[in-house]
């Protein structure tokens, strides 16, 4: 019982106005309510008017009551229709907002899986790669090459020479030895010094280049 489905009649004492007729007594139930709505929902022509007298006779209810019930039924069903439309619009917006998030989550998952498949590079492996790129191409041949270069340097004219011309502290002694040696062989001292100087210069630069080439520097 509430204010929407309850009607209160108040009887006031006094003289009845002229032409006043007591409302007829009738019975209204859910079956008549459904029948009324089925007739109203099938009205397709908006210009066609409802025959209220015929409708009142068929439902055994007064016309004023049927008009009021029609208004209440239309209001109720329009409200239900509005709620359904709002619910569908809300669901559509929810689906649209969830779709991009789902796609972005799948992309992030693919990127993480790809990064997990990459080989792990530690500082040790990076240093090894650097040494391989910048070191000698053939590490096994490096000791042999160095040994050969040293042997060639030992057997060269510079290391086997009796006098050490590069020793500037004993420069005079060395020159004396050179002079005595070449005098015995009958070679002039000044010519010997110039030839020796040029020979030593060429031999030194040549050996340096050969040594650098062998060591792959």
UniProtKB/Swiss-Prot annotation:
This is Autophagy-related protein 29. Its main location: other. The lineage of its organism: Eukaryota, Fungi, Dikarya, Ascomycota, Saccharomycotina. It holds the Pfam family ATG29_N. Disulfide bonds: none annotated. One of its GO terms (cellular component) is phagophore assembly site. It is found in: Preautophagosomal structure. Residues 126-147, 184-203 are annotated as: Disordered. It comes from Candida glabrata (strain ATCC 2001 / BCRC 20586 / JCM 3761 / NBRC 0622 / NRRL Y-65 / CBS 138) (Yeast). The keyword Signal does not apply. One of its GO terms (biological process) is protein transport. GO terms for molecular function: SNARE binding. Belongs to the ATG29 family. Residues 134-147 have a biased composition (Basic and acidic residues). Keywords: Autophagy, Protein transport, Transport. Plays a role in autophagy. Functions at the preautophagosomal structure (PAS) in order to form normal autophagosomes under starvation conditions. Also plays a role in mitophagy and regulation of filamentous growth.
């Amino acid at each position: 019982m509430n204010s929407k489905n309850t009607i209160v009649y108040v009887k006031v004492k006094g003289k009845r106005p002229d032409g006043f007729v007591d409302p007829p007594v009738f019975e209204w139930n859910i079956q008549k309510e459904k029948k009324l709505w089925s007739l109203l929902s099938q009205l397709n022509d908006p210009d066609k008017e409802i025959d209220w007298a015929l409708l009142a006779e068929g439902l055994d209810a007064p016309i004023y009551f049927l008009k009021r019930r029609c208004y209440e039924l239309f209001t109720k069903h329009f409200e239900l229709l509005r709620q359904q439309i709002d619910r569908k619009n809300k669901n559509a917006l929810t689906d649209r907002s969830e779709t991009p998030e789902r796609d972005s989550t799948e992309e992030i998952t693919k990127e993480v899986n790809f990064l997990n498949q990459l080989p792990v590079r530690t500082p040790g492996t990076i240093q090894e790669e650097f040494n391989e790129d910048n070191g000698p191409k053939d590490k096994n041949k490096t000791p042999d090459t160095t040994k050969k270069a040293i042997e060639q340097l030992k057997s060269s004219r510079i290391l086997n020479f009796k006098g050490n011309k590069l020793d500037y502290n004993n420069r005079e002694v060395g020159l004396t030895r050179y002079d005595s040696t070449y005098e015995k062989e009958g070679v002039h001292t000044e010519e010997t010094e110039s030839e020796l100087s040029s020979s030593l210069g060429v031999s030194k630069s040549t050996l340096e280049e050969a040594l650098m080439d062998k060591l792959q520097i």
